[in-house]
From Swiss-Prot:
Quaternary context: Interacts with ATP6AP2.
Propeptide span(s): 27-64
Coiled coil: none
Protein name as it appears in the record: Renin
Enzyme Commission number(s) from the entry: 3.4.23.15
Activity control note: Interaction with ATP6AP2 results in a 5-fold increased efficiency in angiotensinogen processing.
Bridged cysteine pairs (disulfide): C115-C122, C278-C282, C321-C358
Substrates-to-products reaction catalysed: Cleavage of Leu-|-Xaa bond in angiotensinogen to generate angiotensin I
Keyword RNA-binding annotated: no
Cell membrane keyword on record: no
Source organism of the structure: Rattus norvegicus
Protein function: Renin is a highly specific endopeptidase, whose only known function is to generate angiotensin I from angiotensinogen in the plasma, initiating a cascade of reactions that produce an elevation of blood pressure and increased sodium retention by the kidney.
Length: 402
C-alpha cells in the first residue's frame, strides 16, 4: 500500500503528547543583568553634604542595635555605597522595579503607592499599586526591617514576582515609611534579599526558596558578577548556575560556617607578605549588597598602619591618588587558598570629588556579640572574584573574574 500522509491535526496531537511525556530534565537558568550606578555617598558628596555626621549616626546605630532578636534581624548593610541593581516585575500586568540583590538579607520589599505623604523619598521611586494588579492577594501583616541607615516599615502583600524570567507567587513588603537617607537619592527602588529563610523578617519564605521549590533551576545555586569597568555591563546574577564568560579557571569552595547565613571562616588577612590578622579564624560574611570590605575597627587600624595610611574622611580612609601604585597587596585566606587584592582592586576614585584623594574600599565596622565581630566581603571582593552561592551544598565558591 502507498504511504498516506498523516493529517496536520494528528501531527499536532502526536507532538503535544510527546512533549508532555519528555523527561523532566527541563532545568534552566534565570539571568538578571545588573546596572552600575553612582552610590548615594558619591551623590551626597557631589552636593557638598558632610558625610561625617551620617557615618557617625550609622556607627551609633550599630552600637545601640540588638543582634539577638531573631524575629526581627538587623541587616548590616546601609546601602550608602551600593552600586549595582537589576530589574524585576511584580503583579499582573507586571510593574517594573529596580532592586538590590542582597545576600545579607532575605526579604523582598518595594515602595507602595500607600507610602505616607511625609516620606518624600517614596516620590522619586517606582511604586507598587495593588489596585492595578489582577493577581494581588491581600495579607496586611505589618513589618519592619532595620538597616544600618534606619528602618523601613510597611505591610505584607502577595503577588506574582518575575525574576530572570522565572515567575513565583511571593509574599513581599509594601513599604509605606522610607527613610530620607539613603533612599531619597538611591537609584534603586527596593531590595530583594538572597539570604536564607532564617534571616527573613516575619517568617516570609524568600524569593529564591520559592524558585527552588519549583525545581526549574539546573542547580540549587546562584552566582554574582560585578564588572570592574563602569562603561560596560554593570554585572549579572545567574540563577541556577554560573556564566563562564565572566570567570576563568575553576571554582574553589568554602563551606558555610554558620547555618542559615552566607558566613564563612577566614583564616588570615595579610598586607604584603605579613599576616596580620585572623590566623586563629575570623567570621566573614559574603554580602552582595555591601560595596566595601569591612572588619573590626581595631583590625582596620592595623591594616592601615601597615599600608602607611593615616587620613580619614567621613569614616573612609583616603590617600593621595599619586600614592596608590606604592600600596601593597591585601590577601584573605579562605578555604585553604589565598585571595589577593591589588591596590587597583581596593582603592577607588570618587568621580564627583575635585581633589586628589582616593578612597580605600575598607571600613571599620564593630558588630557586638553574638553576631560579631564579623568581617564583610562586599562588592570590592566580588569584583575580583566571581562568586557562586550554593544552597544545596551550603558553600560559597570563588573563581577569578574576567
Amino acid at each position: 500500500m502507498g504511504g498516506r500522509r498523516m493529517p496536520l491535526w494528528a501531527l499536532l496531537l502526536l507532538w503535544t503528547s510527546c512533549s508532555f511525556s519528555l523527561p523532566t530534565d527541563t532545568a534552566s537558568f534565570g539571568r538578571i543583568l545588573l546596572k552600575k550606578m553612582p552610590s548615594v555617598r558619591e551623590i551626597l558628596e557631589e552636593r557638598g553634604v558632610d558625610m561625617t555626621r551620617i557615618s557617625a549616626e550609622w556607627g551609633e546605630f550599630i552600637k545601640k542595635s540588638s543582634f539577638t532578636n531573631v524575629t526581627s534581624p538587623v541587616v548590616l548593610t546601609n546601602y550608602l555605597d551600593t552600586q549595582y541593581y537589576g530589574e524585576i516585575g511584580i503583579g499582573t500586568p507586571s510593574q517594573t522595579f529596580k532592586v538590590i540583590f542582597d545576600t545579607g538579607s532575605a526579604n523582598l520589599w518595594v515602595p507602595s503607592t500607600k507610602c505616607g505623604p511625609l516620606y518624600t523619598a517614596c516620590e522619586i521611586h517606582n511604586l507598587y499599586d495593588s489596585s492595578e494588579s489582577s493577581s494581588y492577594m491581600e495579607n496586611g501583616t505589618e513589618f519592619t526591617i532595620h538597616y544600618g541607615s534606619g528602618k523601613v516599615k510597611g505591610f505584607l502583600s502577595q503577588d506574582v514576582v518575575t525574576v530572570g524570567g522565572i515567575i513565583v507567587t511571593q509574599t513581599f513588603g509594601e513599604v509605606t515609611e522610607l527613610p530620607l537617607i539613603p533612599f531619597m537619592l538611591a537609584k534603586f527602588d527596593g531590595v530583594l534579599g538572597m539570604g536564607f529563610p532564617a534571616q527573613a523578617v516575619d517568617g516570609v519564605i524568600p524569593v529564591f526558596d520559592h524558585i527552588l521549590s519549583q525545581r526549574v533551576l539546573k542547580e540549587e545555586v546562584f552566582s554574582v558578577y560585578y564588572s570592574r569597568e563602569s562603561h560596560l555591563l554593570g554585572g549579572e546574577v545567574v540563577l541556577g548556575g554560573s556564566d563562564p564568560q565572566h570567570y576563568q579557571g575553576n571554582f574553589h569552595y568554602v563551606s558555610i560556617s554558620k547555618a542559615g547565613s552566607w558566613q564563612i571562616t577566614m583564616k588570615g588577612v595579610s598586607v604584603g607578605p605579613a599576616t596580620l590578622l585572623c590566623e586563629e579564624g575570623c567570621m566573614a560574611v559574603v554580602d552582595t549588597g555591601t560595596s566595601y570590605i569591612s572588619g573590626p575597627t581595631s583590625s582596620l587600624q592595623l591594616i592601615m598602619q601597615a599600608l602607611g595610611v593615616k587620613e580619614k574622611r567621613a569614616n573612609n580612609y583616603v590617600v593621595n591618588c599619586s600614592q596608590v601604585p606604592t600600596l601593597p597587596d591585601i590577601s584573605f585566606y579562605l578555604g585553604g587558598r589565598t585571595y589577593t587584592l591589588s591596590n587597583m582592586d581596593y582603592v577607588q576614585k570618587n568621580p564627583f570629588r575635585n581633589d586628589d584623594l582616593c578612597i580605600l574600599a575598607l571600613q571599620g565596622l564593630d558588630i557586638p556579640p553574638p553576631t560579631g565581630p564579623v568581617w564583610v566581603l562586599g562588592a570590592t571582593f566580588i569584583r575580583k572574584f566571581y562568586t557562586e552561592f550554593d544552597r544545596h551544598n551550603n558553600r560559597i565558591g570563588f573563581a577569578l573574574a574576567r
